[in-house]
From Swiss-Prot:
Protein name in UniProt: Nucleotide exchange factor SIL1
UniProt keyword terms in alphabetical order: Endoplasmic reticulum, Protein transport, Signal, Translocation, Transport
Oligomer and partners: Interacts with KAR2.
Pfam families in the record: SIL1
Protein location: Endoplasmic reticulum lumen
InterPro entries in UniProt: ARM-like (IPR011989), Sil1_fungi (IPR031884)
Signal sequence, start to end: 1-21
Family membership: Belongs to the SIL1 family.
Source organism: Candida glabrata (strain ATCC 2001 / BCRC 20586 / JCM 3761 / NBRC 0622 / NRRL Y-65 / CBS 138) (Yeast)
An MF annotation (GO) of this entry: adenyl-nucleotide exchange factor activity
GO BP field: protein transport
Length: 339
C-alpha cells in the first residue's frame, strides 16, 4: 500500500508541474516568498510577502530541477468569480482556463480564507454541470487524489480552533461527492478510507461531516463489505433521530445495508438497525395504505411514486431480506399485499 501511495504522489507531482507550466508569470512588481517542496516533491503555494490577500506557487525548484512558474491567486479575483462559477458556460470556462489558480489556492501554504474561496469556486463549477466534471477527469485525472492526500490531509492537521477547518473539509467532501460518481472506473484506495476514518473519528467532528463521509464510503459497497466498523457507523447514524437525516440520506444508507444483506444473508446487523427497521416498516406501510386509498377514491392529490416505491421496498425487505421471508404475511398486518 505504501508503494501505491508514493507512486500516486509522484504522479500528482508530475501533473502539478504540467499544470503550472501553462500558467502566466505573476506581476513582476510583487515579491513572492517561495516554499520549498514538501517531502512528496510538490511545491506548495506560499503567501506573498507584503499582503495575505495573495498566494503564489512561486518559482520553486523541484528535486528534478524543474522550475515552477508563478501562479498568483488573489482573494478579490476569487470573490469576483464566485457568481460565475454557478453559470453553466462561465463555470466551464473557469475550469478550462484557470484551474491551475484554483489548485494553487487549495495548497497547504494558502490561508484558510483563500482555500475556502478556491474550494467554494470549484464546487460551484461542478454542481449541475456534467461537462465540467468530464473536463476535470480528462485534464486533471489526479485531482481527486490531491483532494484526499493533500487537501483533506492538510486540513486535518489543523487544530479545531480554526473556525474554517470543518467548513473547508465539508467543501472538499462535497467536491468528491460530485466527482467520484461521475467516473465508474474510480476505486477507493485503502489510504483514502484511512483518511475518511481519521476524519470521522475526530473528537469534535460535526454531524454533517460524518454524514458526508458515510455518503462517500457508501458510493462503493465494497468499502464496507466485511467492515463492521463502517457498518456500525452507518446504522448508528441511520437510527439516531438526533442526526436529523433527510429522506434521501435514509434511502442511501438503507440501500447500502440492503445490498450487503442481500449479498450475504448470514451478515448480522446491529439490533438498533433491526428495531429501526421495524418502526419504519410500520409507518411506511401505513403511508402506503393511505396513498392507495386516495388513489382508489380518485383523490387529485399528486402521488409521489418514487417515495411509494422505496417505502414498498423497505416494507417488503423487513422479512424477505433482513428476517424470515415466510413471515411477511403471517406477522406483519401492515404489509401492503396485492393478491
Amino acid at each position: 500500500m505504501v508503494a501505491k501511495v508514493w507512486s500516486r504522489v509522484i504522479l500528482i507531482f508530475i501533473a502539478t508541474v504540467m499544470v503550472f507550466a501553462s500558467s502566466q508569470q505573476g506581476d513582476a512588481n510583487k515579491v513572492n516568498t517561495a516554499s520549498p517542496p514538501g517531502a512528496n516533491g510538490i511545491a506548495y503555494a506560499s503567501v506573498v510577502a507584503g499582503g495575505s490577500n495573495h498566494v503564489s506557487a512561486a518559482g520553486s525548484v523541484t528535486g528534478d530541477g524543474v522550475q515552477l512558474p508563478n501562479a498568483e491567486v488573489d482573494i478579490d479575483w476569487l470573490e469576483e468569480h464566485l457568481e460565475d462559477s454557478h453559470d453553466y458556460e462561465k463555470g466551464y470556462d473557469l475550469v478550462e482556463q484557470h484551474f491551475n489558480k484554483l489548485l494553487v489556492g487549495n495548497n497547504a501554504d494558502a490561508s484558510f480564507k483563500v482555500r475556502e474561496l478556491a474550494s467554494r469556486l470549484i464546487l460551484g463549477t461542478l454542481r449541475n454541470n456534467p461537462p465540467v466534471k468530464r473536463l476535470i477527469w480528462d485534464q486533471h485525472p489526479l485531482f481527486v487524489s490531491q483532494v484526499f492526500d493533500l487537501y483533506i490531509g492538510n486540513a486535518l492537521k489543523q487544530g479545531s480552533g480554526n473556525p474554517l477547518k470543518y467548513p473547508l473539509l465539508k467543501r472538499y467532501l462535497s467536491i468528491l461527492l460530485e466527482l467520484i460518481p461521475f467516473n465508474r472506473d474510480f476505486r477507493f484506495e485503502e489510504d483514502y478510507k484511512d483518511i475518511l476514518d481519521k476524519l470521522y473519528t475526530e473528537s469534535d467532528v460535526p454531524s454533517d461531516i460524518k454524514i458526508k463521509v458515510l455518503e462517500l464510503i457508501t458510493l462503493d459497497y465494497s468499502n464496507i463489505k466485511g467492515a463492521s466498523g463502517w457498518i456500525d457507523r452507518i446504522t448508528n447514524v441511520l437510527t439516531d433521530s438526533e442526526m436529523g437525516l433527510d429522506e434521501l440520506h435514509k434511502r442511501t444508507f438503507f440501500n447500502a445495508m440492503h445490498a450487503l444483506k442481500s449479498e450475504d444473508p448470514k451478515l448480522k446487523l446491529p439490533t438498533n438497525f433491526l428495531n429501526w427497521l421495524a418502526q419504519e416498516t410500520k409507518e411506511r406501510a401505513h403511508n402506503l395504505k393511505l396513498a392507495q386509498a386516495q388513489a382508489d377514491d380518485n383523490d387529485l392529490k399528486v402521488r409521489d411514486l418514487e417515495q411509494e416505491e422505496f417505502d414498498q421496498r423497505l416494507v417488503d425487505s423487513r422479512h424477505s431480506v433482513f428476517g424470515n421471508p415466510m413471515a411477511a404475511r403471517m406477522k406483519d398486518p401492515y404489509i401492503v399485499d396485492e393478491l
